[in-house]
Amino acid sequence: MGAWGITVRQSDDGLDLLDTIVAEQLRNVNFTVFNVSEAITLLNQTIQEEIEQYKQKPPSKITDFYISKTLMHDFINAALLVAECLYDYYQTGELVVYDYIGENYDPVEYHIKNFIVTKADLQPLLAELENVQTPDHWKYQGWASEEILKQWLLHIQSVYQTLKEHL
């Protein structure tokens, strides 16, 4: 798992999901505020729309697999991504994101120092952080080695604890 790290923010899926937040939410507010509830809703709607598009295709094992494994897993990755964004904000006082612009997709760095988050936003994120720590969860089982699994668990537990402190 992961394009180059253990966090969802470092995975291909996480980067795609974060790009959706950048393009659809953060650009609209000139990168001044990250609204957790809006980000969760946006990601869930985007994933659901993609599922609906795939359901319009002729049934096949590949389509069924893509919907049941890849797209359904994106709901979990979306929750973990938003939790990691909050974690970064709580740890550093800001969230650093990149917007890729122009023909060459040149990265422009933004520092978001304002978050809108409620206790109601935190509950489902904490539940998902707890769920993925279960040994029979696909996310838990997906690591290549015991060492990487331990690093990931420490990360998830740290995110969980930090968010729980803000409940």
Which residues fall in each region the model found?
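Low-complexity intrinsically disordered segments
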Residues: K119-L167
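Helix-start/N-cap signature of alpha-helical segments
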Residues: T7-Q10, T32, L71-F75
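Short, extreme N-terminal segment that most often corresponds to the first beta-strand
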Residues: M1-L26
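Residue-level signature of the C-terminal ends
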Residues: E24, Y89-T92, H166
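Short amphipathic alpha-helical segments and their helix-coil junctions
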Residues: R27-T70
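Amphipathic protein-protein interaction modules
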Residues: D74-Y140
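Gly-Asp-aromatic-enriched flexible segments
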Residues: S11, T41-E50, F75, K139, ...
